[in-house]
From Swiss-Prot:
Record-given protein name: Ribulose bisphosphate carboxylase large chain
One GO cellular component, as annotated: chloroplast
Modification(s) after translation: The disulfide bond which can form in the large chain dimeric partners within the hexadecamer appears to be associated with oxidative stress and protein turnover.
Annotated binding of substrate, by residue: N123, T173, K177, R295, H327, S379
Family: Belongs to the RuBisCO large chain family. Type I subfamily.
Species whose genome carries this gene: Atropa belladonna
Amino acid sequence: MSPQTETKASVGFKAGVKEYKLTYYTPEYQTKDTDILAAFRVTPQPGVPPEEAGAAVAAESSTGTWTTVWTDGLTSLDRYKGRCYRIERVVGEKDQYIAYVAYPLDLFEEGSVTNMFTSIVGNVFGFKALRALRLEDLRIPPAYVKTFQGPPHGIQVERDKLNKYGRPLLGCTIKPKLGLSAKNYGRAVYECLRGGLDFTKDDENVNSQPFMRWRDRFLFCAEALYKAQAETGEIKGHYLNATAGTCEEMIKRAVFARELGVPIVMHDYLTGGFTANTSLAHYCRDNGLLLHIHRAMHAVIDRQKNHGIHFRVLAKALRMSGGDHIHSGTVVGKLEGERDITLGFVDLLRDDFVEQDRSRGIYFTQDWVSLPGVLPVASGGIHVWHMPALTEIFGDDSVLQFGGGTLGHPWGNPPGAVANRVALEACVKARNEGRDLAQEGNEIIREACKWSPELAAACEVWKEIVFNFAAVDVLDK
């Protein structure tokens, strides 16, 4: 019998139910560089102390169960258990607390976002002692980061592949998202790329439906982008959505895209799942394909302030699982996105090292070591009048994607693309000359309208379109 087993046997087994805080609330614990750290927003049921609630989260997301079990004596709980090491009250909220939990790295399989989430956000979110629970942030230690491939290529490699520098990239989601035939779909792709866009995009729910099978769409879109490349002298791309009902079918579609010689494919990473996404990211790295990621279903998970998973966590998970682009909100468009919060997770997507900054919702310092960055994609209800704000908010390393803001142009798709390209070039030029895009944005666009009738027409159509709704998910004040 080993000394470890002898020690545990000597303690003896006492059946029954213990309060979680007796084992899992350890305010004296000093976190290790190798721990995964989590910040949970906890809303306990009436009568449940915050220490017990925080300890319950640590227990149920690591080694604990509802009662003492004799097999606890066969392992080292002190080595493997999660620990709630700090609790702080949320200012301005009744009965809400931030519980900080540390997890030993040995609890997680290397290179598996799936396993990490199965532990940290598995059964614990249905725990009866909690009225609500939200995972606000994770600190991923470098030791765990290094077990992931991450994005297939990253920002610099993508720019080198496309030979495009010094400005944001421009995209367009083809509309209507459902119902077009493959040939008409390809026509819209060609017209937008020919007009000056860098990318066009399948919408998230375009897979392989009766009105347009995936193989037909891939063929017509490849023809469209090659024709646009020949006529413009610029490298073009279309995000061919490879998302499918099985991983095998998804990879088959990615293989066909590679055989066509296109530069980029797409995946819906939340509905498709992290295992499928990581598999596709590895295929894209090995075969020179860029990977665009759509976040369909994210608001089901992240929009409510007191329950779910914050998008900054989903963004970190995507960087680990793999993707070269991901939709990140616009701040100014039709979709949810508060400015400081959005800029916080945009930095977490792009930068190598991000300091803790609670003013932007960042609970932990994050060191990504050598993991490539991800381009944030601003998309959803944006048009030419938003271009100065988008350029100022997101900077050069971003993709600005106008669907209705291109295809809704009164003169057609090519002039819609021209209007967006002219507006972007005008904003970049003004910024490089030292002008303030936030203060002078409208004036910059009006000046550009004088030498671009396409832009002038777009400005007239969308001059009164705004989306003035308060964000649901805002920072604690």
